[in-house]
Amino acid sequence: MERIVDILRNLESIPSPSGLSDRVISYIEDLAGTADIGTRRTNKGGLVVGNHSSPKLVISGHIDTLGAMVSGINSDGHLALAKIGGPILPSFEGEYVTIKTSSGREFRGTLLLNNPAAHVNQEAEKTVRKTDNMHIRLDAEVGKKEDTEKLGIRIGDFICFDPRFEYTDTGYIKSRFLDDKAGAAAMLDAMLALGHSGLRDLPVAFFFSNFEEVGHGASAGLPATALEMLVVDKGVVGEKVGGDESSVSIC
């Protein structure tokens, strides 16, 4: 159990919103190497893991997550944002973020409602949260657009939300992006089990896609010889569905 938790903790520590998956793919490549299992990157940057040249079964999950992107720099130096995937903004409000610039620099910040103080804005509680009325406040002394531009922040830079990973004493894991890093961790644990038990040459491949949250995760790159596909992803919990936090859903 500790191995799979460690793998999940490592996956969660590497930001990977759709379009920014190279580091987490490299981590998986290194992990596969410890079990003498080969890897192949797809043209889209996903990863096929397996030694068999003609796999019949593909086990697939995704390592990309929800996120955001800088869509503009406001006159006060705050950042406008566009969503990557479908984050529900009220659940992300107040979250700390890392802005990753194209030059490799990183800056911290917070996602906030415009005019967020309830003492000033009497409509703050009632306001529908959307990208048009929210912003990223940088942890940097900026007061105008030019100040932010001097930091090297540009439109198109990635905004990564903190995962807040926690493994509780009662055996629960709480974190953002368990969709689908929990699934990926389970796949990697199974991959290592096969590799270390001498079964690494079975006609099985693991496929880690990297654009699922924007709608085209496993649409390309699957081995052409695959006859069956097993997809590992989150199980939905909510009204009128059969899932719960302690069960595996098969559909």
Annotated model-derived regions:
Residues 1-251:
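N-terminal hydrophobic/helix-forming segments and targeting peptides
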